[in-house]
């Protein structure tokens, strides 16, 4: 009788141990998923995917919406074209503008398709997904999202975003030298704002503001009106944007001691050099 009782106790222990058994799956990202053995009927491994990455490029973004135009959003956005069997997908990834996947058609260097873009809420809320379309070439792709901020267009570009990094408004006091003599150098009364506008990857415009200088020798007060120097191209040898503009027909208003006149830059020495610093 004692042996039978012992066997019953052992059998119950084995059953309890079996019921408590778990299966732990260790994922490649360091996390774990644990299941009770009773929850698993079988484990099947799916066949290897036939997805192939054809192209993957990193480029810069210019984004427009109902609230802003052509705003530069860095140069780390990635576009990847994937072949899945006989179909093609394009994957978009950017830290600010989210992640998108599109079913696309490739035709003689052009790309077009439909899909969606999922964006993380910068305020910490839930992410949102938006229907979107894609079109362009392998170096310039446009993603259109109609229901985001009154209509949002994300332009992805493969190339050097140097001009867009340089674009912006720069504030400081300016100096003028009268007659080419260093002793007759004067600063503006207040800080002024110079504006650099990107035309394309390697060309900028420079908007020079109205500037006021007081008590110039033999001239009195001087006010120079605003003007724009256009199409200043990147010069690799100078490591700067350079343009001689004496023959561009640029005019400006100038008031000297209360007398206003209209003038044109015609001197062959008229030259502008815009040299970006390390961060653009």
Predicted regions and their residues:
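Edge beta-strand at a domain terminus
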Residues: 50-57, 75-77, 106, 133, ...
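Boundary at the C-terminal end of the N-terminal hydrophobic targeting segment
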Residues: 17-22
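Structured surface patches comprising rigid loops and adjacent beta-strands/short helices at the edges
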Residues: 36-45
